[in-house]
Amino acid sequence: MDSTFNELGVSPALIATLKDNNINQPTTIQQLAIPQFLQHQNLIVHSPTGTGKTAVFGIPVIETLLKKPSKGTTQTLVVAPTRELAEQIKTTFINFAKHTHLKVVSLIGGIPIWQQLKQLENQPEIVVGTMGRVMDLLERGVIKFEHLEHLIIDEVDLMLDRGFKRKLFDLLSRIEKFEQIAVYSASYNEETIETAKQITKNGIFLAAPELKQNAPEPDNKLIDQFVCYLFSNRKKQALYSLVSQTRAKSIIVFCDTKKLVDELCIFLRKNDVKTYPLHGDKAQFIRERNLKLFANTTAPIVLVTTDLIGRGIHVEGVDMVVNYSACVNFETYLHRMGRTGRNNHKGSCITFCTSHEKQAFLKLLEQVNDKRISPLRPMRLRLIPLKCKTQPKKGKLSLQSVQKIYVNPRSNGTFKRVPLAGDLFKSRMRQPERDMQKNKLHDSDWQSNM
């Protein structure tokens, strides 16, 4: 399948706008879904990370609304699980509708309601919102969607993970009428598919032939994956050593808790690393500001975050993703890794892994890379002192010396047993002798357990 946007039924004016946004050729899932959407079908779409999911529904929505006379009211409602994703979808719609009369607003938490109500007075054709704020306004009777053409639920699997199943059906019951409903997600399991069928009344399921799996598939060819075995009390210093020596300029560090995000930001800033935090307890204007600063800077920068931006958010040119703790969830690892290696931009994904996390993480990696992995020897971590005046010059040490976490099979099907990242944190400073002895003891313990 190799269609152009013109063959999919997209108008020349919109095609020109897409080219202005560097969208020249439809992806496989766009080729499948856009014609079905334009035929007013209810859809369940599997659009993995990096396949242009927002454009999958954004393009046909704009195309449909431009062909119909304006009703002077909201005609499209898009519901997303997070504020950041809702804002990104809004920005995409604004870019696509740049040369049209269509108006787009967002309804998200963290923004005063009166400001959003004032925007609604302009009768926008497209509203993008989070579940909480949209339901709040519906329950108050402040807004009504009486002439809705399209209802779009984005990242439905994440909504279910966050316990929004009941609210999804409450939303459907409160919207009096809509012509078409479409559900989109980067991954599907049995519960997600069953819920999506109920929501769409057995809508058409669409997935690109090479992507009919239960999880998103980042392009592993563009992402070098590494694992760093270390002790938990060395993680902070290891992170500092990594960001101080790598060539990467744009780094996202994923943490499991909001408290840890704040702790790491304070720690890295004290050691003169330009760092910004991002998590759900931050005020909305701070979240937006930090994400923009991270996305637009050309200087080396670190964004420390929870899984708030692990799904759906696209930041151009991310060089490296760091998992501060080993992921135990297959989809979480893939979504985090998918923040880099986008649009033919090579990236790295590095995971800090302690001894008790090792076995579970290796099994996860076998799923990701579709191959069995032999037990791997732990590395002996050499750390550079904090604020060390004699530390190596930034950019001098590349990641080329680090071996990939997966092992290429020999011709007879067996796998080599190799160390993973012995040279990752090389430094001019020698480790104290007592630490070296301690590491030797721990190394022997790990080795005996393999």
Swiss-Prot record:
Gene3D superfamilies reported for this sequence: P-loop containing nucleotide triphosphate hydrolases
Chain ranges for the short sequence motif Q motif as given in the UniProt record: 3-31
Motif annotated as DEVD box, chain positions: 154-157
Regions of compositional bias (Basic and acidic residues) in chain numbering: 430-450
Domain Helicase C-terminal: residue ranges: 234-384
Ranges where the Helicase ATP-binding domain occurs: 34-206
Hydrolase listed as a keyword: yes
InterPro entries membership: DEAD/DEAH_box_helicase_dom (IPR011545), DEAD_box_RNA_helicase (IPR050079), Helicase_ATP-bd (IPR014001), Helicase_C-like (IPR001650), P-loop_NTPase (IPR027417), RNA_helicase_DEAD_Q_motif (IPR014014)
Binding site for ATP: 47-54
Gene Ontology cellular-component annotations: cytosol
Protein name: Probable ATP-dependent RNA helicase MG425 homolog
Taxonomic source organism: Mycoplasma pneumoniae (strain ATCC 29342 / M129 / Subtype 1)
